[in-house]
Amino acid sequence: MSEAKGVGGIDPRATPGSAGAGERPPMGTVSRAGDGELYAPMPSKHMVINLGPSHPAMHGVTRAVVELNGEIIEEMKLDIGFLHRGFEKSCENVTWGQVFPYTDRLNYVSSIMNNVGFALAVEKLAKLEIPERARYLRVITSEIHRICDHLTLVGAMAMELGAMTVFLYGIEARDLLWDRLAELCGARLTSNYARIGGVARDMPEGWQEKTLKVLDRVVAIREEIGQLLNRNRIFIDRCLNTGKVSREDALELGFTGPCLRASGEPYDIRKAAPYLVYDRLDFDIPVGSNGDNFDRYLMRMEEMRQSDKIIRQCFEQMAPGEIIVQDFRYALPPKPLVYGTIEGVMAHFKLVMEGIKVPAGEVYSYTEAANGELGFYVVSDGGGRPYKLGLRAPGWPMLAALPVMTKGSLLSDLIPTFDSINMIGGEVEQ
């Protein structure tokens, strides 16, 4: 490895004019450039810097205290909690149906996956079977949000390495998909689309055709992004062999999702423990070999192709039918029944005021979210509110491993490594 150089190419381990080669100068020593010198010598080889939380590369929610030897990271400590809202406790103070808006604020880039994960946990506890059409709609919207999440990561990662064009292309594609989701569920970001027993709304007329047309455009944009980055010398040099994690280390550190698969472990919950209709769909699980930042980028690119494939199959297989269970102990009755019958009024009143009565018990349910395994541990005492709710955030193990992934690497390697794990503050800090 070449020797690390400080600012201006000066070797911080032997700076002229310091208190001695490699020694820390006395407190208060001022270093000034001499006549004819462009840079002042660095006063010490050791430096501790604060990166974030206001630094744009830290996405506003994470502080990293980094100890450097020249430009080499010797140690890093993470300071989190800037986005903590008390998610779990908040959910224990509302009815089961009122939890969904809180889940929207976990991974806010792919919120429908959070909705679906919580709904599946409650349905598993209540032993509730949902209609087939609702299953397909959940998969379609989840995979659309998976593409949006990966587009955001690829665009932000490229932008923070200097490729602004890629970011703009990614945001264009993401906005096209978000517009379709807004037409379906009324919101681009915080969707609140899933319901216990089904989904909130069916597809509006012409929505399938418009979505397929948008997917064609997204495919073209994604291919153009690949052409810009896959053989880009600068992007490859910044990402290849940086932030490496072996398969064994990834498993020991608790990695799941694209970061685990990039390290060579072919584990995907959609295949390992299929839910909804994933067992009826034909799609592949991409697996990396190097476990570095470039593999994690390639993993997202290939997963977008597989999500596109899944969505198109769902449109082909989905048949007309109900979108939510017709059991008014769990689902609100339709408005004609509420306005026209006393039974409908009573069912509506009890669900809104008291909440769904979920049978007493506890369950852990897990799904394959954009960043890995999203798990909900739910405890019910038979009342209308969760007695206890615990969340397994997929991004936390990767964030906790960041000091291990970056130790001994250059400070500049921290940026693509942080981007490639896709730490979302909403889900990690809850």
Swiss-Prot record:
The enzyme's E.C. designation: 7.1.1.-
Keyword Membrane: yes
GO cellular component: a single term: plasma membrane
TM helices/strands, residue ranges: none
Top-level taxonomic group: Bacteria
Subcellular location: Cell inner membrane
Membrane topology: Peripheral membrane protein
GO molecular function terms listed in the Swiss-Prot or TrEMBL record: NAD binding; NADH:ubiquinone reductase (non-electrogenic) activity; quinone binding
Keywords recorded for this protein, A-Z: Cell inner membrane, Cell membrane, Membrane, NAD, Quinone, Translocase, Transport, Ubiquinone
Catalytic reactions on record: a quinone + NADH + 5 H(+)(in) = a quinol + NAD(+) + 4 H(+)(out)
InterPro entries in the record: NADH_Q_OxRdtase_suD, NDH1_su_D/H, NiFe-Hase_large
Disulfide pairings: none
Disordered, as annotated region: 1-36
Similarity section: Belongs to the complex I 49 kDa subunit family.
Stated role: NDH-1 shuttles electrons from NADH, via FMN and iron-sulfur (Fe-S) centers, to quinones in the respiratory chain. The immediate electron acceptor for the enzyme in this species is believed to be ubiquinone. Couples the redox reaction to proton translocation (for every two electrons transferred, four hydrogen ions are translocated across the cytoplasmic membrane), and thus conserves the redox energy in a proton gradient.
Quaternary structure note: NDH-1 is composed of 14 different subunits. Subunits NuoB, C, D, E, F, and G constitute the peripheral sector of the complex.
Protein name per its UniProtKB record: NADH-quinone oxidoreductase subunit D 1
Taxon lineage: Bacteria, Pseudomonadati, Myxococcota, Myxococcia, Myxococcales
